[in-house]
Each structure stands twice: as C-alpha cells, then as structure tokens.
Amino acid sequence: MKVLVIQNRMGIGDMVIFLPFIEAISKKLKTPVSILVKESSKSREFLNDNKNISEIIDLERDNKNKGKHDGFFGSLKLIKELKDYKFDKAFIFNSSLRFFVICKLARIKKVYQYPLFEKKNQHIIKAAQEFLNKKIKLDVESKPEINLDINKINEAKQKYNFSSSKINILLGIGGSGKTKRIPAETFIKFIDHCNNFKDCRFFLATGNHEEELEILNKILGSANGGKCEKLNHLKINE
C-alpha cells in the first residue's frame, strides 16, 4: 500500500505539530508514508531519519503564490507528478477543495480530508485529532518527538563543546509569520530567569528574515547575551 499525507502549512513548527498525526497514520496502516510539504517546513533537514516517512515530496508553492505548483497549470503539473507514484490512499490536513480534486485526478483511490470550507477559526491540533478519529478511528495525542541519529547527536556535542556542568537550552526564536513570532523581551526574561538558578548556555535557532534578525540581535545585546550562541547560519541538521 502506498500512502500520501499532504501538510501544506509553511513553518517548521507546523510540521512538528503534525508529526504525531503523520506517524500515527503510518503505524495504523503498517507502512511508511510519503509526505507532500513545502520546502519552508525544512522537513528534509530533520525528518530524514524518521522510519515512518518513506519519501518527502516538495510542494513548490509558497504563501506568495509562486512556484511550479501554483495556479491552474501548476495544479496540472502536481497531478501528473502524484499520478506517477500510484498512491492508494491520501490524507489531506486541510479543508481545501483544490487538493481534494488534485488527489482524485491523480487517481488516488481513497482520499481522506478535513470537512471542506471550514478553515476559519480551525484549531490546528483539535482539527487534526477529530479528523483522524472520525476517518480511521485513531486517537492521537499531540506530543511531537523528533528522532535523530545518535551519531549526529554526538557530533553536535563535540562541535559545540557541550559540558555536563551547564544546562544547554535550545530556543526557537524565529517564526514563519508575524503572528507566530514572540517578542525578544519574552526570551530575554526567560534567559535571565534561568541564569538566576543555574549556569546555562543558550542556542538561538532562527531564520534570516529581517524581523527574525531583529529579535536575535536584541537577545544577543542583552545582559546575558554573552551566554547565547546564534544558529541562524546553519541548517537544522547541522
């Protein structure tokens, strides 16, 4: 059986939120699944070691409607590409009629999807839970875990000189949109609070958008900025 899961939200955090649901589908159907995701989700950088995912297919369509899968002719290209995979089932984690039609025209026999046209005020986690419970009787808890190769973990420890005498904390300070970004002051208060109790070292993970760099620089310029290391120049798997 060949199974496709479509998760078209753009952020890394979005991908992490949906990961337990994708893994639950794989375990329920007893087969690794292929996922159709945007490049901005960075799935290729942190899901390559996931045994529940067999292939990562790029959805080349961003929030500005650019890319080879955008528009009418882009949809035709995507239909052709998906048809070649010969998928038996598809799970669509959104309420878009577009993806339902694409899956049907790609000759996918069984297509499961959120109720159409119900995107407004849709709770990202509850909608996914209700979807899988209703369609395939799955109860899934929202407890994402990212499984990494132990060798990569040991390499990172050596590269960044992790010390057992310090608490190493990774902070995701970026965001894929303005409404998803937390002010620098919130992180600064957290960093100051932690350092009042323990000797900590902070790694600041973010992108390179202007707003994200502004948050990064404010944190680095704070009282405990010297205990922070920026990671915006690295990929997730680095």
Task: Enumerate the predicted regions with their spans.
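Catalytic machinery of carbohydrate-active enzymes
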Residues: 1-238
